[in-house]
Amino acid sequence: MKQASISRFFKKVSAVNKEKVDQVKEVEKEAEVDEVLDLTLDSENDEEQQQETPVLEPIDGEEHPTVSKVPDLNDSRLLQKQKILNASKDITNSVDVSAFNEKLKDIMNKRKLGRIKGSLIDESDEIAEQSEADEHNIKKKRKKSDQLTPLDRQVKDLKLGNMDKVLVIRVGYKYKIFAQDAIIASTILHLQLIPGKVTIDDSNPNDSKYKQFAYCSFPDVRLKVHLERLVRSGLKVAVVEQSETATTKKFDNSKAKTSVFERKITGTYSKATYATNCEFEVNHENILGTNNSIWALDIEVSDSIYKYYLWSIQLSNGEVIYDSFEESKDNFSKVETRMKYLNPSEIVSPVVDSFPIKLKKRFLDLQLCQKNYDILAEDLNIPKKELLNNRLIELWHILYRYLKEYSNEKLLNIGSNYRHFSQKISIQLQAQTINNLDLISNDDSKGTLFWILDHTRTPFGKRLLKEWLLRPLLSKDAIVDRLNAIDCILESANSIFFESLNQMMKGIPDLLRTINRVSFGKTSQREVYFLLKQLTGVIKHFEAHKDYIEVEINSNSGAIKTKSTKLASIMTQMFEFSLSSVIPQLLLMINVSAVMEKDQKKQLLGFFHLNNYDNSENIIKMQRDIDSVKAQLHDELQNIKKILKRPHLAYKDEVDFLIEVRNTQVKGIPSDWVKVNNTKMISRFLTPRTKELVELLEYQNDLLYNEISKEYDQFLNRIASYYNEVKTFIMNLAEYDCLLSLAAVSCNVGYTRPVFTDSNEQLIIAKQARNPIIESLGVDYVPNDIEMEKDSGRVLVITGPNMGGKSSYIRQIALMVIMAQIGSYVPAESLKLSVFDNVLTRIGSQDNILQGQSTFKVELSETVEIINSCTSKTLLLLDEVGRGTSTRDGNAIAWALIKYFVEEEQCPFILFTTHFTIVTTVKSPLLKSYHMNYVQHKNENENWTTVVFLYQLKAGVTDSSYGLNVAKLAGIDTHIINRAHDVAISYKNDTEFDTNMILFQKVRNILANRTTARETLKVLLELDV
């Protein structure tokens, strides 16, 4: 129906002049049908059609319409058709009618084939532009670049300056993506691609067939959805907006008149910057990019060593990390550890093309960007410059210039955000330890230690708790301070001050992310309001409990201060900020009703409470100018009433100021009145005077909008001037949130406060300890004791059947140490321990095909790294080392490794699980042997022994792994297991007297030569495996 309507319209446009009057009448009759049909122009706009439709701007490349403002979507369609009709009159005067007819037929054929999709606005643009091109082609042949429409020429200029970005450009109601960007976007967004030039520079041979760029488009209300999809696909996306309106273009004489609107980039987005730079309302916590960082990385490559220089910036929390470190060319554990901590999503580097292949394989999921900028004078003010080497300073400039592309460079100027990656006050857990112990997961799913500990109430508190977990404390005093604070919170939980504060924190959004967005000037009005409101709420809470704070917290004899200096310090700092903060005054300057409006333009226009805002003079003056124009429009209405002799006449609305007249009374209308639109019953008009005043009113409204936009930016700058104070306040609140979360953990049944020894001697002694992760999953976990001391049980060798609980046991010890050193209660009857300087693990069996490493190569590489990293205060978990190779080789490696450690002066605390019982033959007072207990029995028709796991640690060694029992549990047929049992017995008899085991013979030779354990291990590790 719609196609037929449009087809009839265009046929009438191409008719001879004597039919023009009839054509206009026919168009008017069809208007009502088209009003409905045009609402279905884009299937993606189904949900948004109910929203208020914005005013259409004039088409790029056309003259401005005679009416300054189109009242609504329905009326606009007819007006656009009338403009096409007027354009056709000019065309028929200068171009042969038959040629123009052919052009129209071609367009209609394309539409029938589904190759053109768009509104009458797009189509009128196309007719005008193509006919203009035809006219010029008649006069002379133009160059390819000159054949572009004014809009396409503007697109080309924008794209040439931003070749690394996908440009999403506003054109009227829609956003369009052109040329090569359109090819990519149409595939990702599943949008129809309109044929045209697919390259900006006409490098594609087929581009010569087209006069316009290929493009795809979507309604402006879908920008948020499509922008996030593009960014999730790993693209860097720039949004281009119109920076002027039709009215401003007409009245502003300071700029040269052009046929297109001025456009500029208003926002650039990537995975790491989306959360900070997006200007949409965010209704969920896990917005894209919240936890991602941007890296600037440089590498010095030598024959055997890579030296890394690193900057990392996390835009959501403002953290700036710097580091430099070395690794051997075949080892990337330090890089992987930093990736685990800092979670980069994009890396900028001057040497990306020179990255070693093995390193690039680790960055497969990241965006790599090669950049090398010249150092400019404006970049020279580097915070903490005295702590940086020359390579880091050069790399800082690259990061600064890169962030400037996103308008996020301001954070690099705040010295309080800087810190070195390796902090002496905490342990830097390695990536393999984090993975092997299931400390965290990328999606915060169940089955991790963080999932157990996380009872935080705020997003920024949650991030800080995760940082605490990955960085256990090294200072006993700092650990005890946290434990004391937890106890104090539990004892004070019933006080009105703490109870109210705890309830208030439940609804607080991500204030840390918001204050960083404010510093970038990227925040919506509603977001600013809620930032100030939430901060003011906490401030008012402290002010309301001033007496309690003075007596219980600030006083030296106060209950809080005597029990926990840490908790008292947090509360005191927050209280002092509350007394001096201007945040409540800034909140009063905001008009609450305006920021709750759905329309963003209304939010901005009404943002300031003018009675309270201290710089409202210009705004008030402009509002008076607008009121003056409206008064003149009402005066004009009185004249119109007299002309029409309708004393009760009123404007249709006070937006477009149209006069509605019944069609039966149209004959009495003055000839100079302009008909804007009509229906079957009425017609709407503008008088010459109202037309003039409406245009003036729009211009005044544009000036007001620009003025308030400037004032809003100044308001954000005013808030940002208190960035350090506000961030400190938020971080204090985050720290209290973490302590409150750990206090909730301490309430779990069977959890106890760990006790740290005053002596320097290392030990772990626990009664009835449990694995917190397995227990939390609903398993009835069997508790076990732990006893490891400096001179006895420093090395525990644990044997036992498969699935007997060996790995779970050693993991629970490491988990309890980490929990204790972040200041948490632990799952045990009691725990006494000393502070460990690291927790290292070698658990699991896996290969690394991408890096060309076998399972055993990975195992030995990690083992060598552990040997080089551990000290006498390190807790070391070794789970079945040697299982990645043959039994003989594995026996030898495991034995030599334990022999090496027990002879070392800096022997760490070791938990060693194995099926190689030869390890227990190592003689040393430091070593104790245990196994996981079980009972065994035989079933009928089964040659092998079936075991029942008791999961209890028992002194001594077990000589069988009972792997056939696991085969039964896995459902393997009994006949196969019986056969396997016979083979196992035969194999055992053959190997017991085998004196030709190569590696054992080498060990005997080494011992006979009285070599050291280190030399023994070195020989074994250098074997070709």
UniProtKB/Swiss-Prot annotation:
Molecular function in Gene Ontology: ATP binding; ATP-dependent DNA damage sensor activity; double-strand/single-strand DNA junction binding; heteroduplex DNA loop binding; Y-form DNA binding
Gene3D superfamilies (UniProt xref): 1.10.1420.10, DNA repair protein MutS, domain I, P-loop containing nucleotide triphosphate hydrolases
Keywords: ATP-binding, DNA damage, DNA repair, DNA-binding, Nucleotide-binding, Nucleus
SUPFAM superfamilies, alphabetized: DNA repair protein MutS, domain I (SSF55271), DNA repair protein MutS, domain II (SSF53150), DNA repair protein MutS, domain III (SSF48334), P-loop containing nucleoside triphosphate hydrolases (SSF52540)
Annotated segments matching region Disordered: 41-70, 127-146
Region Mispair-binding domain, annotated ranges: 142-272
GO process annotations (BP): meiotic mismatch repair; mitotic recombination; removal of nonhomologous ends; replication fork arrest
Sequence intervals crossing the membrane: none
Gene Ontology CC, one term: MutSbeta complex
Span of the signal peptide: none
Feature: compositional bias, Acidic residues: 41-50
Pfam short name (any one): MutS_IV
Location of this chain's protein in the cell: Nucleus
Residues where ATP binds: G800, P801, N802, M803, G804, G805, K806, S807
Domain of life: Eukaryota
Principal subcellular localisation of the protein: nucleus
NCBIfam families: PRK05399.1 (NF003810)
Protein function: Component of the post-replicative DNA mismatch repair system (MMR). Heterodimerizes with MSH2 to form MutS beta, which binds to DNA mismatches thereby initiating DNA repair. MSH3 provides substrate-binding and substrate specificity to the complex. When bound, the MutS beta heterodimer bends the DNA helix and shields approximately 20 base pairs. Acts mainly to repair insertion-deletion loops (IDLs) from 2 to 13 nucleotides in size, but can also repair base-base and single insertion-deletion mismatches that occur during replication.
The protein's assembly and partners: Heterodimer consisting of MSH2-MSH3 (MutS beta). Forms a ternary complex with MutL alpha (MLH1-PMS1).
Listed PANTHER family: DNA MISMATCH REPAIR PROTEIN MSH3, DNA MISMATCH REPAIR PROTEIN MUTS FAMILY MEMBER
The family this protein is said to belong to: Belongs to the DNA mismatch repair MutS family. MSH3 subfamily.
Protein name: DNA mismatch repair protein MSH3
Phylogenetic placement of the source organism: Eukaryota, Fungi, Dikarya, Ascomycota, Saccharomycotina
